[in-house]
Amino acid sequence: MDFKKLAAEEIKKNIDLELNFIEGLIEVPPKPEMGDYAFPCFQLAKVLKKAPNIISKELKDKLHSKYFEKIENLGPYVNFFVDKKIFTEYTLKEILLKGDSYGSSDMGEGKNVVVEYSSPNIAKPFHVGHLFSTSIGNALYKMINFQGYNCTRINHLGDWGTQFGKLIAAYNRWCNAEELNRDPIKELLRIYVKFHEEAEKDPSLNEEGRMYFKKLEDGSEEEIKLWKKFKDLSLREFKKVYDLLKVDFDSYAGESFYTDKMDAVVEEIDKKGLLVESNGAKVVLLDEYNIPPCIVKKSDGTTIYATRDLAAAIYRKKTYDFYKSIYVVGLDQSLHFKQVFTTLKLMGKDWADSCKHVGFGLVRFANKKLSTRKGDVIFLEELLNKSVERTLEIINEKNPKLENKEEAAKKIGIGAVIFTYLKNNREKDIVFDWNEMLSFEGETGPYVQYSYARGKSILRKSEEASYDENQIDYSKLGSKEEFELVKILENFNKSIINAINRLEPFIVTRYVIDVAKAFNKFYNAHSIMNAADENIKKARLYLVKCTCQVLKNGLNLMGIEVVEKM
């Protein structure tokens, strides 16, 4: 039951306008005393040739519905006050009926959506910057799937490119075999950083790197063997992190997967008369779009990642026939994706507009931007383990007798990190602050998880007070705090759809924060176990149960596990 739609349907009986148009105009008033929904009459003034205030008064007098306890006009607005009992009963019954699927829908109708995310570079550490893409992508995947789409998760590994020529050159010159066996990623990072340091003094090293990559592209056995070694060592390390995060993928087809598909793409671009030569390189001119040329082949004949992304997009359309293809990649790649998507459009790919770049900001520690070339890297596995350790210290301090402390610390600590990445608009930079991130107060992961655990604790205490959920008296949940909580719980599906439409997972994060805040306001304002009478107690326990279900579902969509006891 959609109460906003019910208000729109009531208005439509009296005004000759499309239902969707009316529904689109309906707002949520800024204050509860102004109603639950408000319909502005400004747009009707020209048609009806009357002042909006008069229209709202005349319209209000014609509106009657059992779903609204009263309908009032206030200036140019018609304000709808839902019937609290009907609204509460419908919402809470719906939550417990659907359980873990509450908030889901069949909006996607099985359409295929591809989400590319995480995509770390082979032979480089999985650092804290990679978790931005991983967290956003995993949350979008879960939310999109939850709304009835068929979603495919792609980890487009950075396993090809001139950096591998540089790494082979560095490996041949400086690699310590013993260190490589002991800690492969750190040793590969060390020699990669050394290469860039030495190349600043001796630029001919860059030429050597290009030469090795050309050999790699030409299929040289020795270079391919080294490249495979780097890849195997890296994937082994990445798996440790993905296991900690409980993140999976349907495909690990990285840049190298498309090496045998690029010639056909370059040929297709050439046949369409789009390819021109510029300083020895092959490019697609995008001047009419005010975009710099898209380089398809460099002057030495090697491809760049634009070529591979063009091949990947075409392959994915052919393989998955996607309705939408989403790329969760840093904001610094915005121009690159504009070039790729515009080139696809010029190639006659009418689906190019279905490709969306979901950019995100930077991760900072002490005002530093992370850079692999300079070695300014904070390894993600270390950060996650540190977060778990710090959380365990807090638990030992606050509740040393807690069962399964290590398991709880793992869920809270890792959840706190993910929550930090998803808390704000994805384009904002993140500055890590341990004290804030692990606080059990304020807008944090531990605060939301604690709210869930508090609710579950209440429910465990009430187990002996069994009751028939079909005999709940919903009129007992009429206080301001109770009804505000119910209204927020009802809004779950809308917040997910809003997050999908805007490709902004933080909308759901802010939503679960709102649920936790409203729940704690209710908890602090009203006694549950010692309520005035048994019917109030049962109704409030029912509300607690529904709140826990919604918090669990919301955290799950963010890739965060709940903790039953804290």
From Swiss-Prot:
Main enzyme class: ligase
Keyword Coiled coil on entry: no
Cell compartment(s), UniProt: Cytoplasm
GO biological process, one term: arginyl-tRNA aminoacylation
Cellular component GO terms, alphabetical: cytoplasm
Key words, A-Z: Aminoacyl-tRNA synthetase, ATP-binding, Cytoplasm, Ligase, Nucleotide-binding, Protein biosynthesis
SUPFAM superfamilies with a match to the protein in the record: Anticodon-binding domain of a subclass of class I aminoacyl-tRNA synthetases (SSF47323), Arginyl-tRNA synthetase (ArgRS), N-terminal 'additional' domain (SSF55190), Nucleotidylyl transferase (SSF52374)
EC number(s) stated in the UniProt entry for this protein: 6.1.1.19
Gene3D superfamilies associated with the record: Arginyl tRNA synthetase N-terminal domain, HUPs, Isoleucyl-tRNA Synthetase, Domain 1
Disulfide-bonded cysteines: none
Record's catalysed reaction(s): tRNA(Arg) + L-arginine + ATP = L-arginyl-tRNA(Arg) + AMP + diphosphate
GO terms for MF: arginine-tRNA ligase activity; ATP binding
Motif ('HIGH' region): 120-130
HAMAP family: Arg_tRNA_synth (MF_00123)
Family under the similarity heading: Belongs to the class-I aminoacyl-tRNA synthetase family.
PANTHER family reported in the protein's UniProt record: ARGININE--TRNA LIGASE, CYTOPLASMIC, ARGINYL-TRNA SYNTHETASE
Subunit note: Monomer.
Name of the molecule in the record: Arginine--tRNA ligase
The organism's taxonomic lineage, starting at the top: Bacteria, Bacillati, Bacillota, Clostridia, Eubacteriales
